[in-house]
Amino acid sequence: MDIPRIFTISESEHRIHNPFTPEKYATLGRVLRMKPGARILDLGSGSGEMLCTWARDYGITGTGIDMSQLFTAHATLRAEELGVSERVHFIHNDAAGYVADEEYDVAACVGATWIAGGVAGTTELLAKSLKPGGVMLIGEPYWRQVPASEEIAQACGVSSIADFLTLPGLVASFDQQGYDLVEMVLADQEGWDRYEAAKWMTMRRWLEENPDDDFAKEVRAELTIAPERHVTYT
């Protein structure tokens, strides 16, 4: 069980696997007003940066679930590095359909709502692991400008215009599901640049070190199109 290899390769040097920066995560942790000892479940936890830094800075405890063997190993090492390995734990598992045995104060899925088929399915999934009165934390891309055609949407790297909503549409969707939106922190262009552009050097160095790998052709193809796709559509 693992994520597609292109992500394992291209994001192998990432600490954060979405367009948030460390500063954005610090802001998000602060505005959530979590008390020390608050328990967080993070589905699609990646390399664990959110849980590890929040354990260090805000005294939370937590569990992260991720399908990537590499990222889960990185998360465990990061917890040890920051001295929080007794507070946060990371499990290599499929986050799709994952329901915790215990209820959490915060149930999160940041940038991985595909685990439940989108935002609506993810809210339903997270609610099953959330204490009454708890906080649900969801990170989701949105269209700043709706593509004029399905072809343009696919050029952005998604399968359909329907994959994402506009920001007003996304905000309205929570109300439609019966939830109050109580805070918001938005990624910015710098965060998108850091998330996307950091992949390019990683892929280039991987190609230099693995020229005869059977997967090199796919990595080369992605490296060729990724920069122009990013500056055109992000």
Enumerate the language-model features and the residues they cover.
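Conserved alpha-helix/loop element of class I SAM-dependent methyltransferases that forms part
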Residues: 18-36
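Conserved class I S-adenosyl-L-methionine
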Residues: 38-44
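A short acidic, Gly/Pro-enriched loop at the edge of an enzyme's catalytic core
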Residues: 99-107
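A short glycine-rich, Lys/Arg-flanked "PGG" loop and its adjoining helix->strand segment in the class I
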Residues: 120-135
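Short, glycine-/aromatic-enriched active-site segment of Class I SAM-dependent methyltransferases
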Residues: 141-161
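Conserved Class I S-adenosyl-L-methionine
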Residues: 183-234
